[in-house]
């Protein structure tokens, strides 16, 4: 599927601010399941933009605006192709085994997904043993999260801990992803957080689909399939209906924007995403 994406992020400040510095991780990510064709980032007011690749392979832009401003807008425009039509099928060529050094970040506790006894207890209560390390085992874990947790807006924030989510069994896609990551790691499966977009419902007539935010899911590594995505929010294995933007240990590694400024001002954030199918 070929997709065009427009992501608008706008910060409004209650007073002039200066020396705004912001990391932007709005990709898109390029790998064997997704080919990046075009990407452009625009910043208002005009500032410097420097591109680099972070330690997880994410395309990252460092935006700096030195002059006084009361508004900062970042607009990214992307065109890409997603190619994984049958995500449940094992690849024709066996995946490259992960070296221990490649696994450590995605098996160890991370800032937003600590090692909680709740994860092991949930695995035991569901009857999971070693088979959770298989593709089918991870698929079942993803469905377990989907079935046991309620999708509910405005009950959590980006600061809500995974321990709180485990207690209340409700949240949004970020929370579902953190719970599934914790379960996978407790079962010995390398798992990482993915930020991106869902585009499976795009109309074929080039009409835009507008969303208010990005989406989140999990990629887990199994010996038969390599890295594959599992969307516990929607109870699906991730294929060409998802666009990957960034990966990391948890949300803290892939936050779309993160930065600072100098000045005594409150800020208000607004995000609009538009996606178009162009094939």
Tell what function each PLM region has.
Residues 1, 7, 20-22, 39, ...:
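Structural beta-strand/beta-sheet cores of well-ordered domains, especially the beta-sheet scaffolds
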Residues 1-125, 131:
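Linear, non-domain "peripheral" regions
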Residues 9, 156, 233:
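Ser/Thr-centric signal marking residues that sit
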Residues 13, 48, 94-95, 103, ...:
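Glycine-rich, flexible loop/turn motifs
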Residues 27-29, 44, 77-79, 221, ...:
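Structured loops at beta-to-helix junctions and adjacent beta-edge loops in soluble globular domains
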Residues 47-53, 65-67, 81-84, 114-123, ...:
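Noncatalytic linker/hinge segments flanking ATPase motor cores
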Residues 80, 89-91, 98-171, 179-181, ...:
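Secondary-structure boundary elements
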Residues 143, 175-265:
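Hydrophobic/aromatic-rich core segments of domains that either
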